[in-house]
């Protein structure tokens, strides 16, 4: 089983996006978080399945929202680098360790 480690800024991105969606429509923030959890489960089931996008980083898009989880795998750790809004500039997260 992989240990999930999230970059602090990725956690902030997740929380900010959930708040933003919730402000737009009550309950939408919870649906966003559900979609995040579903995406994370898919990654954990097959972490090496998804596309490389930069160096050792991989990306998997959410099903229902225009977002993606950017992550890398090292030994028994899955590092979440970003919870990226796909409408935002690409690779803003590239310097995160």
Regions found by a protein language model. Name each.
Residues 68, 72-97:
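Enriched for short, Lys/Arg-rich terminal
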Residues 1-57, 74-77, 96-97:
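Basic, Lys/Arg-enriched alpha-helical interface segments
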Residues 59-61:
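Short Gly/Pro-enriched turn/cap motifs at secondary-structure boundaries
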């Amino acid at each position: 089983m992989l240990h999930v480690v999230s970059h602090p800024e990725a956690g902030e991105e997740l929380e900010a996006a959930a708040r933003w969606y919730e402000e737009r429509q009550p309950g939408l923030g919870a649906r966003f978080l559900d979609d995040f959890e579903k995406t994370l489960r898919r990654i954990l089931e097959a972490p090496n399945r998804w596309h490389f996008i930069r160096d050792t980083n991989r990306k998997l898009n959410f099903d229902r929202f225009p977002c993606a989880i950017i992550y890398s795998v090292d030994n028994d750790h899955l590092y979440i680098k970003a919870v990226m809004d796909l409408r935002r500039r690409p690779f803003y997260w590239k310097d995160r360790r």
